[in-house]
Amino acid sequence: LTPTLSQRERGQEKRTPCSDLSSYQKYSSLDKPAPPTILLAPMEGLLDFVLRDILTRVGGVDRCVSEFIRVSDTLLPERVFTRVVPELLNGGRTFAGVPVRPQLLGSDAVCLAENAARVAGISPFGVDLNFGCPAKVVNRHGGGAALLQEPELLATIVPAVRRAVPAHIPVSAKMRLGFSDASLALECAHAIASSGADELVVHARTKADGYRPPAYWERVADIGAAVSIPVVANGEVWTVDDALRCRAVSGSHMLMLGRGMVTDPGLALAIRATDAGAAPHAQGQGSVAWRTLLPLVGDFWQLVHSRLEPRAQAGRLKQWLNFLRRRYPEAEAAYMALRTVNDPKVVAAWVAANVPER
């Protein structure tokens, strides 16, 4: 495994110019495997291969979607995909055995199609398209959620990618409800679903909403009723109770967990346990005991320490502890102890003193 690329590095990887769509195979539908129930969300700058590894060890996740790989006007070399999604070097799975689907971000149908074809050659679990990123730098270049202002462009991108990818490889997409408002939500969803996508994840907020609550799960229900492909609900699922309410309101049994899973690594397992008839755990507490999670925090640090540049290491551990402290008093104490620390050696000493050896 190798470190992920920065956004700048991704944009600077230039090799083969993109061509046209004429050589792509005609798409013919085949039987697809049943969709999973709980997905782990792509989160740029947070949920990279290191945290995917740790969270999938806890369990309960059926599939992950990677952070985005930016596609501009070139055919990227294979090493770009494997740097961002090193699980591709492990058969497309995390070390816990959970499938990972690479996500592409761009606005050029030709280049997205060519890059999708290339990544499909090393990604047995499909290709995902990003139509929801709210980052200003992405939107200024016409990518991510900016595409939700142009349903007709979505209706060009999705079929181009679908034709370029072998028929047995799934193509999915993730969208928000819209850019400045949700007026085009159904039109965008229909453009995606009717163009050959196998699955659609809907983050139940607009770009303008950002990450502010609430998530409008009822709009996911509207989309689910309007399209004929599986629709996955995403947004503001922090607890088992949230998951149950989201399913009820959205009409979707499929959930994508993001910040809720980073905050409570046992959330997916807790949802499954509740589905199986277990009593929900107390709200406001972590779904797995701190003594169970602490060794994984140590493993996370070891991965960060060995894979990332020294200047990024302390920040990554503090970033995760900042989420964990919402559920774990012990994480609050750890975060406060390390809050002003940037020296990896000092962090390593703290880990050695506080995390039991396996």
PLM feature spans:
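Intrinsic disorder/low-complexity segments
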Residues: 1-23, 280-285
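Alpha/beta catalytic cores of nucleotide-metabolism and tRNA/nucleoside-modifying enzymes
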Residues: 20-39, 44, 50, 164-166, ...
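Glycine-rich, positively charged N-terminal anion/phosphate-binding segment
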Residues: 24-30, 43-118
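Hydrophobic faces of well-ordered beta-strands that scaffold small-molecule active sites
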Residues: 38-41, 64-66, 100-104, 127, ...
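Active-site beta-loop-alpha junctions enriched in small/polar residues
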Residues: 43-45, 69-71, 105-107, 132-134, ...
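Short acidic/polar active-site loop segments enriched in Thr and Asp
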Residues: 61-62, 125, 198, 253
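Short glycine-enriched, charge-decorated loop/helix-capping segments at active-site entrances
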Residues: 79-81, 142-148, 275
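Alpha/beta enzyme core
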Residues: 114-127, 131-143, 152-229
